[in-house]
Amino acid sequence: SGTVGAAMEGFLFGIPSIAFSQVDKGWAEIEAAAATARQMVLDMKSQQLIGTSPWLLNVNIPNMPLEALKSIKLCRLGRRHSAEQAIVQQSPRGETMYWIGSAGAAKDDSEGTDFHATAHGHVAMTPLYFYLIYYYILGYWAQTASKLTGVAS
């Protein structure tokens, strides 16, 4: 998601980062989501849980009134089926535009996932880990790179 992408930027710059998202479409309970996010950050700060080492959290908040929200659950990520296909359209200026299709339906929404937690009214918190270098395959590419010229013949 774009929210996780933005938080990832902070993480990659060494900043503890949180991606807060409200589950489902609509803004009906955006105040409840904002209050929940604010309280989580204040709690982390007051309990000195933020620290200086970078970390990345994905937090999904159900779209429901504040009094209906349940506790925070630590979760793994659920999985989705593939997204719908992109839709090709023309802009008013005649340029080609691509609308990315809707996210796919849940493929794994079992207990322990963020999908399951939010479907049952809980705030889902998932620690993420992301680095752009695939360290486990560096050895392979070190050998392979020496066989490449990088110049068209």
Model-identified regions with their sequence ranges:
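Electrostatically charged, flexible surface regions
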Residues: 32-153
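Hydrophobic/aromatic ligand-binding patch that stacks against planar heteroaromatic rings
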Residues: 6-10
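Charged helix-capping and loop-helix junction motifs
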Residues: 1-5
